[in-house]
Amino acid sequence: MSNMKLNNDFYYNDKIRAIDAKEEALKIAFYPITFQAIRSLLETGLLQKISDAGDNGISVKELSAQSGISEYGVGVLAEMALGMGVLKISSQNENTADTSKSSLGNLVLGKIGWFLLEDNLTKVNFNFTNDICYKGAFNLIDSIKNGKPEGLKVFGDNWTTVYEALSSLPEREKKSWFEFDHFYSDAAFPEALPIVFQKKPKELFDIGGNTGKWAMNCCRYDKDVHVSIIDLPGQTNVAEQNAKEAGFQNRISFVSGNVLDVNTKLPENADVVWMSQFLDCFSLHQITKILTKIYNSVDENCDIFVMEPLWDMQKFPAESYALQATSLYFTCIANGNSKMYRFGELVEAIEKAGFSLVQSHHNLGANFYSILNFRKKVNK
């Protein structure tokens, strides 16, 4: 199963023209700098001012006057953005306030610029990359060599994984992390709930429940279900407070601990075990270990649901690209040994623990999640 053919011919053919290949290579050479150019345009408000100017556009001189940034500063950012297709030069340059021969003319927002400014998916990814990944990525080589998240040290030396650090991150970084984490899975919840509740489970275990969003969605969806959130102490503390504020303190319980720790005992009698964007936090070997612990705590009637964005099951190449990039976050920041998985390798790791794949659902939500339904093998 792990050798199944990928669904995009892009991964197999190399038909790109040499001149186009060179262009792409040159873009890669400057990506770190061009990324920061766009960040500067966003955080100074310059990109928004250009957008607000509409089809007539706005000159570098006007942008400088409005922002208090030198014409030089505005100019170098604008020229880079032109080269990236983020900005365009207005065809209505007779309206420009800067008539000097050296003027670029009026700048207008291009389609790429619109997505950087307005598209929530792009903004979440951009902020996550800048606030969580960018500085730590300089340690990617060491992370690859050592099998440890060497980039995490940019936030401090007290943690071995990012999950232990979450509650201690600065507010901006914490906000970017949680917005990234929630943005993807939250969009799939409306389609996931009918799948999980098809058999009307009474007891649901949410392993890796994080802030409790899924658990609270379950309580709203089914008035009779009880949910147990199993996660690290920092996360269960936050989830418990959120559950209390939502009025679900009597329907959501909490088990604090590391599921990989032999001393962490899972509760029993689950009708459903749910793991959303949780297993990608572990290596394949660790996934098998976690599922073995689950295997020993559930009976043959329990349904295991795993929701993950599998990069080889995405509808569009850009989504696969984003997931492949997210794998590098796991390598240098999160834990040093996990990634965003392919369908076959994830199924194989889970089945090694004694489960069989019963059913799979793909392309759920705007971000194309998969839900994999497993049950215990009759004869392990």
List each language-model region with its residue ranges.
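Alpha-helical subdomain
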Residues: S2-I89, Q198, E203-K380
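Conserved Class I S-adenosyl-L-methionine-dependent methyltransferase catalytic core
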Residues: D9-I16, K22-D55, A65-Q66, Y72-K202
